[in-house]
Amino acid sequence: MRAQPFTASVGYAGASVRADFIRRTYQHLAGAVLGFIVVEALLLQWSGARGLVRTMTGGHAWFIVLAAFMGVSWLAERWARSGASAQMQYAGLALYVVAEAVIFLPLLYIATYFSSPNVIPTAGIVTALLFGGLTYIAFTTRRDFSFLGSILSLGGFVALGVIIASLLFGFSLGVFFAGLMVAYAGGAILYNTSNIMHQYRPDQHVAAALALFASVALMFWYVLRIVMSLASDD
């Protein structure tokens, strides 16, 4: 007999079900981070990496990259939230991890070959500490941060508009914007961690892991930009 899918959120489930859901979510998050590292390392060692970076960053190609990434992200999240099959959910998570690795390639290529060797480890440690602190706050306070959803949606559209304007008119966003985006990513981590405790169904651990991974990746991107900027000023 086929198992019936969960219909109620994990917030209404028993303690053992919640604990199992949280454990599986963070296991899948760890797997996504590890997968990202492996794919990124392979891309950086690939002989065609330099040419791909030039193609991605030349002219208005970055618009195409961003549009493709947004489309892939939408598709991946839809697959990950699918209740049809576990295979489709895992396909969504894997697709998103690969897409993140590709869009990170230009930034990490520059950080690897043209910046201090300490910038990537430093950014990784800072991101991990911020993520750990925000996760601790969300789990210890047990507050429902779902109210952040509308704020994050509005902020995301504003940030996207600023990024597109910078690409069109060629101005640098600078460290201040990067700092604001780190704060935005922190809000997204609080929001998604709260959803893990209150909103997701017990069978949506893959989707929950994808949402957390997206927030962590966003934070790492802008923390790395800040660290690279500070390193270049030394």
Question: What is each residue range found by the language model?
Answer:
Residues 1-234:
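A hydrophobic alpha-helical transmembrane-helix feature that marks the membrane cores
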